[in-house]
Amino acid sequence: MAVISMKQLLEAGVHFGHQTRRWNPKMKKYIFTERNGIYIIDLQKTVKKVEEAYNFVKQISEEGGKVLFVGTKKQAQESVKAEAERAGQFYVNQRWLGGILTNYKTISKRIKRISEIEKMEEDGLFEVLPKKEVVELKKEYDRLIKFLGGIRDMKSMPQALFVVDPRKERNAIAEARKLNIPIVGIVDTNCDPDEIDYVIPANDDAIRAVKLLTGKMADAILEGQQGVSNEEVAAEQNINLDDKEESEQAETTEENTSVESN
């Protein structure tokens, strides 16, 4: 059974590309036709590519890896945050701050500041500090949460990036490529697919299309996590079975020894 259906893709408007005058020739192989000056994406190829991306992301999740969701354009912000949180992953849905990946040591100091301000409020310092200073601290906190809240628990590099619109997120992609972090991306007809390891040819401007595909990547992560859980349970059950067998063998030996003694 396919990960996603043609019907789902059609209903979400995934097939609508950009105007023919705004295209990247490298996307030609993913284009089905042109209609009224707009390129129509070949959804048969999209179905296949979604499946490839899904399996890759699921494998990362099965191995305990993390995925950083990146989508700062207005149409992607809500879906990126919601789906990343649903899958327990990291996200950046506002401006990409330079160095999030390549200079994480500096970024982590700014993230640490979030906890520092929270502790100040918890300890009651806001009650004794001058009102103007408290206002400035709250502004600083809101700004930090806005840009870094989605990665505040990211203690190490993610094992993959999921990106909505490579043209918009070129800085994030450049950092990921520098660190050899694989990239999965929703790639429209005006983008360069060569920058992306797992291309999902699709409309990156329609909210429904972005939500559908971002949701599928979150589903892949959750399925992978379930696989990890099942393996852990199975391992525990095997250990318990081994212990039970050893216990039963010991009891049998004791019974035999007792019978022989009598």
From Swiss-Prot:
Name the gene for this chain: rpsB
**Key words, A-Z:** Ribonucleoprotein, Ribosomal protein
Q: Which PROSITE patterns match?
A: RIBOSOMAL_S2_1, RIBOSOMAL_S2_2
Task: Report the sequence similarity comment from the record.
Answer: Belongs to the universal ribosomal protein uS2 family.
The keyword ATP-binding appears for this protein: no
This protein's GO cellular component annotations are: cytosolic small ribosomal subunit
PANTHER family named in the record: 30S RIBOSOMAL PROTEIN S2 PROKARYOTIC AND ORGANELLAR, SMALL RIBOSOMAL SUBUNIT PROTEIN US2M
Gene Ontology MF, one = structural constituent of ribosome
| Single GO BP term | translation
* Sequence ranges of Acidic residues compositional bias: 243-254
Name of protein:
Small ribosomal subunit protein uS2
Q: Where is this region: Disordered?
A: 228-262
The species this protein belongs to is Staphylococcus epidermidis (strain ATCC 35984 / DSM 28319 / BCRC 17069 / CCUG 31568 / BM 3577 / RP62A)
Specify the domain of life of the species encoding this protein: Bacteria
